[in-house]
Amino acid sequence: MSSTLSSHNVIALKASNLHLQLGGKTLLDNVDLEIRSGQITALLGPNGAGKSSLLKVLNGEITPNSGSIEIFSSPKDHWPSELLAKHMGILPQHSTLSFSFLAHEVAELGAMPLAISNHQAQQLAAKNMVKVGVDHLANRLYPTLSGGEKQRVHFARVLTQLSHSGEQCILMLDEPTSALDLAHQHHTLEIAQALSQQGAAVIIVIHDLNLAAQYADRLIILNQGKIQADGTPWQVLTPTAVENVYGWPVQVIAHPEHNYPVILA
């Protein structure tokens, strides 16, 4: 994607009055939010708070009962699916794939919306596998990979998909660190951070408050389908706010070198 400053601080995604009810349970209760380019926005909250439901509504996987979504100032319904695929990439928490593709073939699937040659797709996917750190797995059968390895291969696929997004880029990550070890958690979030610094709008569903505080520019805490807090890490992660939402007392201190909040439970 392009790294021009004009893509920063643009409203990439706007949601108005989103309401979602499934099986008689309200999952989203009239949610309003704007997601801006050039930022990482982390969606936080306890289990069942509505985080993944919100992400799935924003990316079109689930249709809300009511409400509207705009992507770069145009109604989402006005975006042809093949065009939207070039500008919005989604890494789900769990990716099911029943065919015995090689890992590099999975990464190359990201090039399908790009209308490029097979050779170009292979080069692009190989580049992103190196970036994610899975190039050594390129010729492994995908089903033989560990959960974390599969997740990283799919991240390479999503990066390949967004490689021609230009200034309009939205990256959605649903629990991207859940199956990863410490080093790969930070490496994944560093890649997301670099994309946001180039102008991408990055939305991450994450449970780890400390990782969110370290990497996100903006935190949104959801609870019972409603936004309970929205702001910078220091504005949102107060002891009172965290205890009220999660039901557990915490202390909040400043990181000794980088001054982001650190949660001690």
UniProtKB/Swiss-Prot annotation:
- Where, in this chain's numbering, is ATP bound? 45-52
Which protein is depicted? Hemin import ATP-binding protein HmuV
Disulfide bridge partners, by residue number: none
UniProt GO cellular component terms: plasma membrane
Membrane topology per record? Peripheral membrane protein
Gene encoding this chain? hmuV
Q: Which Gene3D superfamilies match?
A: P-loop containing nucleotide triphosphate hydrolases (3.40.50.300)
Query: Taking every annotated instance into account, which residue ranges of this chain make up the domain ABC transporter?
Result: 13-249
| Main location (coarse class) | membrane
* Recorded family membership: Belongs to the ABC transporter superfamily. Heme (hemin) importer (TC 3.A.1.14.5) family.
What organism does this protein naturally occur in? Photobacterium damsela subsp. piscicida
An example molecular function term from Gene Ontology annotations: ATP hydrolysis activity
Described by its record, this protein's role is as follows: Part of the ABC transporter complex HmuTUV involved in hemin import. Responsible for energy coupling to the transport system.
